[in-house]
Amino acid sequence: MTKAERIKQTRLETNQKRKEQIPVVYQLKVNLNSLSKKDRQRLFFLFSEAKWLYNYIVADIDSRLKYETYKLSEVEIKAGDKFETRPIENLSSQMRQAIVERIKQSLYALHKSKDNGNKVGELKFKSFVNSIPLKQYDVTFKFTNEQKTKVKLQGLEKSIRVLGGHQIPKECEIAKAELVRKASGIYLHATCYIDKSLFIKTWENRVNRKQVSKPREWKTFNQAIAIDFKPTGVVLSNGLKIEWKIEETPRLKKLQRTISRKQKGSKNRQKVRVKLRKEYEHITNVREDIVNKISSLLYRYDTVIYQDDNIHVWHKGQFSKSIQTSAVGEIKRRLRNSLRVSTVLIDRYQPTTKTCSQCGNEQEIELSDRVYRCAICGNEMDRDLNATYNLLKLVGLDRSEVRPVEHETTVKIFGANPKVLISLVQ
């Protein structure tokens, strides 16, 4: 059997095995304090060299985008008004190959978008490359101890200490990773594959940093729930209304004013830019924390019924600012891809808002009308709650009132979060 045939056979076996597995990405933070000054500089130089190689290829894609490009030991880049030669010393061969493959994938995506009738441009130069693919475990990277607290990267002499390796279960198969640079530090995003039959078990029986099993306390609600999405939150069929708003912080606005006054290219501007990136990352983390808590609440139900709303269109309407800061689309995506709760998707053209949940009368309702008033039976209730009742009726279920255990669990999950408003609607 030739090498090409062995690769083809292995790829077929892997694809067959992946059908029974689910990918999970674990985020590990690199402990920069454990590195020497020299090793820290080499780690950050990986991202600089990745940028140089990327821009070198993009400058002349027709002649430079080829297989042998990853073998280059130096590239020519434009620095100001002149060209300079920069060495590629720290990037390993597989890291360079992954960067070349990333450019090919970007070109393919542009080609597909053009075939769909969209207007496309061309690949542009990058000021920063903040992620480096590590495409093969045991070659590009590997954990050097059983606790998964040390990682050896191809091209670097010493192992790097990482925090959070205890999250990765022993039953999983580590496939690939990405080295990601953020304002708060450098992270390793490890992609692991877990058998679908073991996914819930490994999630419930997590281990702490001392490798001690700590089962999760997981209260479940043995009933179905319907959810209606809003630009600023969600409404559940049990009457719970959860709203949140993540706006620009005063510190962010102040930093934006400060950086506009700094001279371009100066060190002071660079310092403010780092602070600005950290503030943006903080806002993103706050938003993601709320999405995680909403998902945690919904996963406790047996079934979640929701309508296939075209949230992409909401970005173009009068609620565009609200929908961009609420991350409602992320909640919908998690429900669609989740294995921890069964979901029922209702067609987006079902008139759930226009229909009375009491008598079935269908009538027009303005967007400004927050209360549904039926002209036939006189039913008056919140328009979003009325929509959730109709979602339940479409799958043959009755509505349910909020129970004390649901209310207590919701309050416990969100805590005293000043950015989240929890209320009951009728």
Where are these regions (language model features)?
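Stable alpha-helical structural segments in soluble proteins, enriched in small hydrophobic residues
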Residues: 57, 95-111, 385-398
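Long, hydrophobic, amphipathic alpha-helical segments used as structural scaffolds
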Residues: 58-65, 107-118, 194
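Short coil/turn segments at secondary-structure boundaries
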Residues: 62-63, 72-73, 114-126, 267-274, ...
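Positively charged, helix-rich recognition surfaces that bind polyanionic ligands
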Residues: 187-426
